[in-house]
């Protein structure tokens, strides 16, 4: 079948009779492609008849070929400049049906509203830490990587700067990591005058630190924003070293369903290759995260990485009060060569 941005445009079924150990080439009639977007040719091999080992229609293999058609047209838009307020503590951007407030004391965005609905409860925080897995613990990673825990969680907010552009307001917050050797990193918010918000975390790298578990931005959102759908690799959780069996498509789940029932709470629910992610409540109030250039990794859970880290068992987790959305540039894999010393690849 042919898909565009996860939506099936055309599908077809044909039969093959290929003896074991041989191969055969089939000619496909391809759908005409005349618009920009990401396209996927998806081929799935299923059993034609019921056998002793599988029912008819059982998938035994699949493959996907992904390609993109660029849109070279530059849209002509006339933007009405929103009201920008520069206060002692708050910088506010107020436009038609949206408002954004940036806190110079807190060090980030403190309010994001669309149609008077508030989406965040606290300034998003950069995190370099994940809740350690059983494999991580077996490889002594909590000890080896401990500096990354403090680096993000206890980072010191230092300065803020801003630049008003023709069609956006760019605000950059600078932090100093709580580790030795220390380093600075920035979070830049670009408040576009059409209501979109661009976010960029910049980490230049530092020598003398162990491998980084994750580079992510954590959003603490309202509890009712617990449903999510995304276009990326799925349908189940997957990681950089556990994604070969995942397929690109449109998937949906909830924060509760995304929490794995491990005896010892730990990192779970990650997705790789994500192009877009929409988090919404039952009334369809929603916020969409979209890739800027490269696909990202993400998770939507009822607990933060630090809450999962602190609990020894599931019943020690607190009552659900928020939905935690993690947008990550990259996270290390989960390993599995063994659980008593082998690090992740």
Role assignments for model-derived ranges:
Residues 29-36, 66-345:
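Beta-strand/loop-rich accessory regions of lumenal/periplasmic or secreted enzymes
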Residues 2-46, 50-56:
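Intrinsically disordered, low-complexity Pro/Gly/Ser/Thr-rich segments with frequent PxxP/GP/PP motifs
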Residues 50-76:
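Short beta-strand elements
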């Amino acid at each position: 079948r042919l898909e565009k941005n996860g939506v099936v445009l055309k599908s077809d079924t044909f039969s093959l009779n290929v003896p074991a150990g041989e191969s055969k080439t089939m000619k496909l009639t391809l759908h005409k492609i005349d618009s920009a977007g990401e396209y996927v040719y998806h081929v799935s091999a299923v059993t034609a008849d019921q056998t002793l080992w599988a029912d008819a229609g059982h998938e035994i293999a699949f493959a996907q070929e992904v390609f993109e058609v660029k849109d070279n047209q530059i849209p002509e838009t006339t933007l009405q400049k929103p009201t920008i307020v520069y206060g002692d503590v708050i910088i506010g951007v107020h436009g038609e049906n949206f408002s954004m407030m940036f806190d110079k004391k807190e060090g980030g965005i403190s309010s994001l509203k669309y149609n008077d609905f508030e989406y965040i409860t606290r300034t998003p925080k950069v995190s370099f830490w994940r809740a350690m897995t059983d494999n991580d613990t077996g490889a002594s990673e909590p000890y080896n990587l401990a500096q990354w825990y403090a680096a993000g969680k206890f980072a010191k907010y230092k300065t803020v700067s801003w630049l008003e552009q023709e069609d956006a307001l760019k605000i950059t917050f600078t932090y100093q990591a709580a580790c030795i050797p220390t380093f600075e990193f920035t979070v830049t918010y670009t408040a576009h005058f059409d209501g979109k918000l661009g976010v960029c975390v910049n980490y230049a790298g530092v020598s003398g630190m162990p491998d980084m578990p994750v580079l992510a931005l954590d959003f603490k959102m309202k509890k009712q924003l617990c449903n999510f759908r995304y276009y990326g690799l799925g349908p189940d959780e997957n990681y950089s070293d556990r994604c070969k069996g995942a397929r690109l498509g449109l998937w949906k789940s909830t924060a509760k369903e995304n929490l794995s029932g491990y005896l010892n709470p730990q990192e779970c629910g990650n997705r790789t290759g994500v192009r877009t992610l929409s988090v919404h409540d039952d009334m369809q109030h929603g916020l969409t995260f979209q890739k800027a250039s490269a696909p990202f990794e993400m998770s939507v859970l009822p607990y933060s990485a630090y809450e999962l880290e602190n609990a020894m068992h599931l019943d020690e987790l607190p009552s659900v009060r928020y939905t935690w959305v993690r947008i990550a540039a990259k996270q290390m894999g989960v390993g599995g060569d063994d659980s008593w010393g082998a690090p992740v690849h």
